[in-house]
Each structure stands twice: as C-alpha cells, then as structure tokens.
C-alpha cells in the first residue's frame, strides 16, 4: 500500500530554534516551566537530553501499537538508553482483563494508572493516543516538553472521539494518522507535526481500518527524522521517534 506523506511544522517563536534556549513566548506556548537544564518552576530538574521520562495515555488497539513502539526504545543498552521511565494511564474497563493498552502494560510490567489518577511522578513529555478524555491545562503544564497526540485521522477532519467509525460511516476514501501538539480545552486542536495518509480499503469495517491505521501509527512512531536540537518539545519528540526507528531497523 502506497503511503502518501505530508509533514507540517510551523515556524517556532523567536528564541526556540536549534542551539538556543526557548524564549518566554515559546515556553508559554509549549508549556515549558523552565529552560532545559534548569528548573521547571516546581523545583524539578528539567532534562535536556535522553534518557527521557514519558507518561503514555491510551486505551485501544491503535494506542497499544503506539505504546509498543515507545516501549521498544527502553532496552537498547545502557549507553544508548532513550527512555528510562515509561508509565501508562488508561480508563476503567468493565472487562476483568482491561483495555488493550492496560493488557500490554501489565504484560510488560509497566506501571499503570486508571484515570483520573495520573500518578505523582516527574515526566519530561506526555504521549496520548485514543484516550478519549480531555486533559486539563494544569495537567498539560506538568510536562516540561508538553504532550503529543497520535490521532487516527487526517486532522482537522474527524477530530474528537471515534474518528475511525466516522471515516467508515461517511465513506471517506482517504484517511491517515496525525501527530500533533496538544492544546488545552479542546480535543485534537494544535500544531500538526507529522501527518501520513493512506487509501481506505474498499468495503472495510471499522475494525479492519483500525488494524491498517494501527500499523501506520506504529510505523510513524518508528520512522521520523532526528532534529538538530532537543531544546523544545517538538525537537524532543522527533528525536525519540528517530531513535525508535533505528531500534526497529536493527
């Protein structure tokens, strides 16, 4: 299946470029409490290089594949360690086994919290995939490098819940996956960092399309170029994705 790729990354505010510390404007935009290598405003030390501390929010099979790709970044040898802390937040489920993300986290011995509990640890960046809960501004601001959303549609189309179901019901012929930066107060609104599109297979069900987009989403979390700087959240996450890409290629 041919994948059409579109990348979109807006201009950074002055002072947020490679080799420079983020300006106050950029820190406010990205939710930075302080400069990398300094204090985050709550007394915690903000890291400017790996290994990173990541909190993942997700529920379904699509989210599980994104989590699996991030989890693969943890065990590459101490000298190449990219993530030294990966914890998971999911939502309560009526099933005793829990949702796919919880099943994977338990099997992989990752710490799991049930929303609204998000733990009390310190993290560098958050990652959201198919979570279905609106994150408060106070929560977003706890992450020095902000929170990224991996969303199974070509935003802005089908922002909000059940994008795969809407894609099928409305007969869309093209869909995709978007990686974007989360903003407070609204679902799936913020700068688009990366977007890839695929044709919708004819007569596909929502479950079949979810499988297609799960593979695409995981592939995007494995294949993104390394940025020249880690001084802002966008650069941090593209660096993570590039390193994960190398893990899966080796």
Residue spans for each PLM region:
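One-carbon transfer enzymes
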Residues: 2-250
